Amino acid sequence: MRYIAGEYDVCVVGLGHAGSEAALASARLGLATVGFATNLDAIALMACNPSIGGPAKAQLVREIDALGGEMAVNTDKSLLQMRTLNTSKGPAVRSLRAQVDKKLYQANMKHTLERQKNLDIKQAEIVDILVENNKVVGVVTKLGAIYKCKACIITTGTFLRGRVIIGEVGFESGPSGLFPAKELSEAIKRLGFKMMRFNTSTPPRVDKRTVDFSKMIMQPGDEVITPFSFMHDKIEIEQIPCWLTYTNEKTHKIIRDNIHRAPLYTGEVEGVGVRYCPSIEDKVMKFPHRDRHQIFVEPEGRDTYEMYIQGLFSSFPEDLQMEILSTIPGLENAKIMRPAYAIEYDCIDPTQLKATLETKLVEGLYFAGQVNGTSGYEEAAAQGLMAGINAALKILGKPPLILDRSQAYIGILIDDLVTKGTNEPYRMLTSRAEYRLILRQDNADFRLTEIGKEIGLVTEERYEKFLRKKIQLEKEMMRLPTVMVRPTEEVNNFLISRGSTPLVSGVDLYTLLKRPEIDYKSTKFLDPTRPDDILDSVAEQIDINIKYEGYILKQLRQVEQFKAMENKKIPEDIDYYQVHGLSNEAKEKLSKIRPTSVGQASRISGVSPADISVLLIYLQQMRRKRSDEAKIN
């Protein structure tokens, strides 16, 4: 029997990484919000790797933080180890990667949700979405409780009709032994949404006491920890190392000889898998010329013996997993605590969404996270934040927040999903960013914090911290060209020691800092008027902005061209089948996606440059016609 149990502005279904951010954003913007999880002990569950960040993902985390989200703050509070990746490369691809205590991460996020004003969290399985006149009006729990709402955000991750496969054994399940959400998947289909079936896999966890680390290569954290959150100046903890080992020909032979027992190869798994996170059987079969593959052994927490075997994702039966482990140096006697498994699940075709992550089909219904066909905690959290923000802004009667491709990786992620869709689990990559030199992890606050403040998500404390940094940077960038450096013996000895050419005449410090061998901090002795309180993060900005000035200016000019196309808006009521000259494929794709700008239309697969030219002419004629009609009236 159904009954009214409560009424809220926003209901969030699922409290993983997307759901947690969505619920917090909505509540922090003043909306009465309720979040549902099938198990409150699994909030922000790290069902796969116990880490946050990495290339492109770190940029997302920093952007979430700059807008006032929680992931970076929670990562810093749960840290085991921090490493900066790609340090030998340019700043565009440098990325933080944090190893975290996964249980502490969950506990900290639950603690944050429980104490958030305007937010209730409840343990319940949602089985139906109530819709009236194409508008969402509520959700229903398995026990019959109805929660009325003005907006609903679906963030169900891999739970929709989840099915776990380990070798010959397959059974209905969510990740990590949790219950799947079967009825909700059917409810979403009944509303008319097109569904897809994807899969992902996770490696075994082994007992630390059975691992021989003497046969592995230690992977320590950075000597000085760089916090993920802009709110934290420093973190001082005892870091726990990760370890590196390799597969070998023995490993590969076992896999080749038993490939008929891998469900990912036998057809037992029907979902489409992750391209950039392949199973070990995939790696061995697709790259036969490789004589070894990296295996990272990573801690899952400070107070557990479980170790995560990164690189050994698999759907093989447990006996074969044990045999494979026995061939790897250091893991010969490792005891499995949790076997590897593959999980397949339902997700929606994301082209059914607007750029706000609201569905085109049902007003007030939003989707975010892996249910949109993405992979990764960071991608999920970014979508959750944006869905929470936009659901709240819609209810408050305010304009939506849509970040474009030149503003943030978040903008690229959402634009790719709603414009191009995906036929496999989507992962964020730096190569997807056209303007990655200006979308760095180090400048996310400069790009987005003022936007976060404007919508009301950034706290006064965060904003004041940001302003101090911004003012310091602006003052230094103006002061440095006025500081003259003379070709003294001391100066030239310093330059020679750095592998740089000695000076023959005076030069300003701004120009000197353009040299790749010279960094801002090392020139303090040349600069007597330099303030003593310059932040490390400001020093980093100075070096990057000066050294890459030419490239940054070039990219900013490209952004201007991009913006020009984005600013050419397309009327909502346009009938593409009436646009003569468009190819049939373009008519079909444009009618399905309903792009809001010519720029977005140009990124749709199947829409050619010739189609865009036709569309531009049509829009010009349309505007002229409407202008003439307005004059007559």
Curated annotation (Swiss-Prot):
Subcellular localization: Cytoplasm
Pfam families (alphabetical): GIDA, GIDA_C_1st, SAM_GIDA_C
Gene3D superfamilies from the UniProt entry: FAD/NAD(P)-binding domain, GidA associated domain, C-terminal subdomain, tRNA uridine 5-carboxymethylaminomethyl modification enzyme MnmG/GidA
Major localisation: cytoplasm
Keyword tags: Cytoplasm, FAD, Flavoprotein, NAD, tRNA processing
Positions with a binding annotation for FAD: G14, L15, G16, H17, A18, G19
The name this protein goes by in its record: tRNA uridine 5-carboxymethylaminomethyl modification enzyme MnmG 2
Top-level taxonomy: Bacteria, Bacillati, Bacillota, Clostridia, Thermoanaerobacterales
